[in-house]
A protein has these predicted regions:
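A conserved pocket-lining segment of Rossmann-fold NAD(P)-dependent short-chain dehydrogenase/reductase
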Residues: 32-45, 55-79, 83
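Glycine/proline-rich active-site loop of Rossmann-fold NAD(P)-dependent oxidoreductases
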Residues: 13, 26, 39-54, 81-82, ...
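Residue-level detector of anion-binding/catalytic polar loops
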Residues: 29, 65, 161
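Solvent-exposed polar/charged
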Residues: 24, 58-59, 123, 156
Length: 183
């Protein structure tokens, strides 16, 4: 997406372009990735478009019915926080002579819609329920994003590969949140 409409997207592209400028003009070793939605068991959801994918786990662990603000069938790329941290470290440690794209590496891990994550959780929490109450603003933002990102350059230039898929992330999220919310 080269013409983003959200403040996050605008500032991200601005940073990428400034980083390219400083690399080309002054030789500053700049590097950046384009993260998908990040799912964390440490940071609670803050109301962003992709935060439904964190909030749904909290609802499952608390035994609450989840009210999904994104409509069924809306695919979005997501990544578990341990993979995001690992990607940042891998890129920082990468051989600079092999980096062609430097400041605009797409990285991907998994792409799913609300139904898919719901069913992944339901395998472990059989009584879990979900209903939809679509937030028009969040849905517009979600609809403006690609369904999936091509991370071929990151894989080829610095060996990016995620460790988590939806199933392994779900097991870990449920385990960590059960422990966290017990306190």
């Amino acid at each position: 997406i080269q013409r983003p409409r959200t403040m996050y997207g605008v500032t991200k592209v601005t940073t990428e372009l400034l980083s390219d400028y400083y690399f080309n003009k002054y030789g500053v070793d700049t590097r950046a990735v384009r993260f998908p939605g990040i799912i964390s068991n440490v940071t609670p959801p803050g109301g962003g478009t992709t935060d439904y994918a964190v909030d749904i786990y909290y609802s499952a662990v608390r035994g609450e019915k989840f009210v999904c603000p994104i409509k069924e069938g809306t695919l979005m790329d997501m990544m578990y926080m341990p993979d995001a941290l690992n990607a940042a470290i891998m890129l920082m440690e990468a051989d600079p002579t092999k980096l062609i794209h430097r400041n605009a590496f797409n990285i991907a891990s998994m792409s799913f819609d609300p139904e898919t994550i719901f069913h992944a959780i339901k395998k472990h929490v059989p009584a879990f329920e979900m209903i939809y109450d679509v937030d028009p603003l969040k849905q517009r933002i979600a609809d403006s994003w690609p369904d999936s990102l091509d991370d071929t350059c990151a894989r080829e230039e610095w060996g990016w590969k995620p460790a988590y898929d939806l199933e392994s992330m779900t097991v870990d999220m449920l385990e960590k949140l059960r422990e966290k919310l017990k306190k």
